[in-house]
Amino acid sequence: MIRRLNHHEIDFEKYSGCIEKSVQKNMYARREILDFWCESWDILVWKDYEYVMPLPLTKKFSQKFVTCPIFCQQLGIFGKNDSSEINERFLSYMQANLDIYLYSFNAGNHFQRDLSFRKNYFIPCGTYADQKKKFSKGRKSAIKSATGLDFQQITLNSVILEFIKRFYKGLSKEKDKKMMLDYLQFLHGKEMIKVCSASLNGELRTVALMGDDGETLYLIGLVSDEKFRNENPTSFIIDQILQDNLENRNFSFMGSNVRNIEIFNKSFGAELMKYPVIQHSKKEVLIQFLKNKLS
């Protein structure tokens, strides 16, 4: 029932149709996003594209490994509904036939066995007034204290890119930072990005960078000049984004397992949505690679 299709064998019209109609639909599984991030990618398919599972691949030691790229938070199995039985078949096929370093399923995938999980916080589309009732007292206070700040939706321009280069802290490797900046410009070209700013007297305090697929905003980065932290620009900007967008967009914080960030996300009344992951250490991957070579 499950077949692996190499990239050149994929019927992309059927693949994209399955993703668009799926109950697990997200931005990360779109063809153009995977084409940008992946060295190469294949898929597993159930019957005639009733369910699909993208496989991002990278090559190390002359061997291809499955590993999810940066900013592709949740891939997994996509279809007309979620079936733990079908999900198990995909997982068993994957484990038996592929070398896996890191693979993240989506929050809509459920299994009959225990897997590790990572955290995401998510706010479903609805009224801002109802959502604000769920804000923590501390977050409401921080928003109230953020007086005098100016909120704007802006374009991704050279000033914003320079601000990101100076203050973005989420990535330690320079090559990853460059890829992130390239990704932002790629999304800009596809009209799939929303950029918002909080400033005081024309001076930037915080910039929010979000992927936008027409249904959900995905928080790629919240970039701040830390010397203005006491002005609470991050609380202010998220609140403004929710006010302007929540009636027609879901909002995904894209994380986080980091405690301080988790508390921040949760304080806006966001729902915890765990997604299953398979991850092996580099040592485990190397051992498996050597076993395959010797077998």
Where do the PLM segments sit?
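Short catalytic-loop micro-motif centered on adjacent basic/acidic residues
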Residues: L102, Q152, N250-M254
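Short, conserved active-site entrance elements at the starts or edges of catalytic domains
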Residues: I154-T206
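Conserved donor-binding loop and adjoining core beta-sheet/short helix segment
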Residues: G17, R31-N87, L200-E226
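Acyltransferase donor/substrate-recognition loop-hinge adjacent to the catalytic core
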Residues: M1-H7, H110-E174, N292
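Non-catalytic accessory segments adjacent to catalytic cores
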Residues: S84-N120
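Alpha-helical membrane-targeting segments
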Residues: K60-C68, E203, Q279-S295
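N-terminal charged segments
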Residues: M1, N6-K64, K169, K173-H188, ...
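Aromatic (often tryptophan-rich) hydrophobic motifs at membrane interfaces
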Residues: R89, M192-Q288
